[in-house]
């Protein structure tokens, strides 16, 4: 089971500084969509140039022109790129092919997908490396949790890894870990903590059963 740090609300320099503080406890560091919107793909390159020992994920939430957009993210140092599960099959297929051609991985974000099990099965067959159940910021505010979605997706896939995103914190991660996802994504639970290093360590300890 891997741990990913999602960084959304910092600039690229602050993101790299935070990532380096916690890199001993995380496997993947995400340059979140807000950073990409504010600073572009050079933010991905900046992180890649300033950290060792972790994979860098570019959260582009691709919807169309997928092979081109994946190729650009890879060019700027991304190891993992995200596409939306509601994208057309042709877009998913193009993204998978482009990522794999370059030895990189594709994470499919299931935010706003209505029939989770049907789409997860299709994405599994299309070759997605990760299928991520995602309770977005707006639904988190309404008290929703990704755990039931995680169970639904896990029950129908054979090849893809399952990731879980949305409101996970050090004090709630154990209930997520109990569902045995392959990747747990924590954002503000680490980034906004008074002590991000301690928060990252607590998350990693939970994943490793300590």
From Swiss-Prot:
Q: What does this protein do?
A: Catalyzes the condensation of ribulose 5-phosphate with formaldehyde to form 3-hexulose 6-phosphate.
Q: Where is the signal peptide?
A: none
Instruction: List the EC numbers from the record.
Output: 4.1.2.43
Record's protein name:
3-hexulose-6-phosphate synthase 3
Q: Which CDD domains match?
A: KGPDC_HPS (cd04726)
Kindly state which reaction or reactions the protein catalyses: D-ribulose 5-phosphate + formaldehyde = D-arabino-hex-3-ulose 6-phosphate
Give the family per the record. Answer: Belongs to the HPS/KGPDC family. HPS subfamily.
Source taxonomy lineage? Bacteria, Bacillati, Bacillota, Bacilli, Bacillales
Task: Kindly report, in one word, the top-level EC class recorded for this enzyme.
Answer: lyase
Single GO MF descriptor: hexulose-6-phosphate synthase activity
Its GO biological process terms? 'de novo' pyrimidine nucleobase biosynthetic process; formaldehyde assimilation via ribulose monophosphate cycle; L-ascorbic acid catabolic process; one-carbon metabolic process
Q: Which domain of life is it from?
A: Bacteria
Pathway assignment reads: One-carbon metabolism; formaldehyde assimilation via RuMP pathway; D-fructose 6-phosphate from D-ribulose 5-phosphate and formaldehyde: step 1/2
Query: Which UniProt keywords are given for this protein, alphabetically ordered?
Result: Carbohydrate metabolism, Lyase, One-carbon metabolism
């Amino acid at each position: 089971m891997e741990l990913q740090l999602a960084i959304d609300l910092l600039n690229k320099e602050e993101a790299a500084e935070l990532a380096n503080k916690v890199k001993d406890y995380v496997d993947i560091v995400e340059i979140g969509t807000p950073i990409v919107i504010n600073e572009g793909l050079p933010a991905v390159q900046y992180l890649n140039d300033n950290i060792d020992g972790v994979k860098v994920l570019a959260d582009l939430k691709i919807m169309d022109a997928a092979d081109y957009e994946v190729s650009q993210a890879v060019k700027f140092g991304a190891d993992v790129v995200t596409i939306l599960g509601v994208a057309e099959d042709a877009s998913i297929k193009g993204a998978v092919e482009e990522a794999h051609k370059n030895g990189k991985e594709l994470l499919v974000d299931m935010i706003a997908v209505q029939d989770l099990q049907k789409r997860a099965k299709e994405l599994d067959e299309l070759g997605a490396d990760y299928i991520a159940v995602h309770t977005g910021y707006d639904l988190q505010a309404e008290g929703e949790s990704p755990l039931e979605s995680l169970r639904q997706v896990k029950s129908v896939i054979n090849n893809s890894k399952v990731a879980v995103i949305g409101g996970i914190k050090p004090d709630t991660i154990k209930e997520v870990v109990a569902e045995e996802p392959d990747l747990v994504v924590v954002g503000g639970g680490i980034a906004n903590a008074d002590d991000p290093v301690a928060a990252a360590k607590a998350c990693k300890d939970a994943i490793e059963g300590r």
